[in-house]
């Protein structure tokens, strides 16, 4: 009876495809509906899923706005290029205290022998360029997350990591806690 919150297509996928369908039929998990831009409250915490463009062959892809008693965050671990989204990321960042955003790849060429244009994620260098007009205070809200094993930001001593931090952005590490 573990609650699993899912958008409509993901719920259908879990119900109709093994081995996940067994979890549903045996009631190991109980699907709870999520809807685009519909807020769910959990005590002092509220969560609002919103659709973002990304691979959708099986399910929707969503980001989340999370509101706590004192602070707020956006969480966007997966998205296509920012230009594919109808929302202005810089303006959205101004409305929250923390912005945890997709940093799958640092830059083009990170996957040798693979056409990176076919792997839809914003590069960290693109995200920084998009957000360079923000004040340092606003850039300090940004936490790069969801890094591929090839991403040089995983090495805290890399020149790329130092460059990101020198521009006022943050690189999330395992175990980080951001108080809401």
Model-derived segments and their meaning:
Residues 1-24:
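Active-site HxH/HxHxD metal-binding segment of metal-dependent hydrolases
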Residues 11, 54, 105-106:
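Short, solvent-exposed loop/turn segments at secondary-structure junctions
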Residues 31-92, 176-180:
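Core dinuclear metal-dependent hydrolase active-site scaffold
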């Amino acid at each position: 009876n573990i609650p699993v919150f899912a958008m409509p297509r993901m719920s259908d996928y879990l119900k109709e495809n093994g081995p996940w369908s067994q979890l549903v039929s045996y009631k190991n998990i109980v699907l709870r509906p999520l809807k685009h831009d519909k807020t769910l409250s959990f005590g002092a915490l509220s969560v609002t899923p919103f659709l973002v463009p990304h691979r959708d062959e099986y399910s929707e892809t969503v980001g989340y706005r999370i509101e706590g008693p004192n602070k707020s965050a956006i969480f966007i671990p997966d998205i296509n290029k920012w230009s594919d989204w109808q929302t202005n990321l810089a303006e959205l960042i101004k409305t929250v205290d923390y912005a945890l955003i997709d940093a799958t790849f640092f830059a083009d060429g990170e996957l040798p022998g693979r056409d990176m244009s076919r792997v839809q994620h914003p590069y960290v260098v693109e995200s920084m360029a998009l957000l360079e007009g923000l004040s340092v205070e606003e850039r300090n809200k940004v936490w790069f997350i969801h890094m591929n094993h090839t991403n040089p930001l995983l090495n805290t001593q890399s020149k790329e990591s130092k460059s990101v931090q020198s521009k006022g952005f943050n690189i999330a590490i395992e175990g980080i806690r951001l108080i809401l």
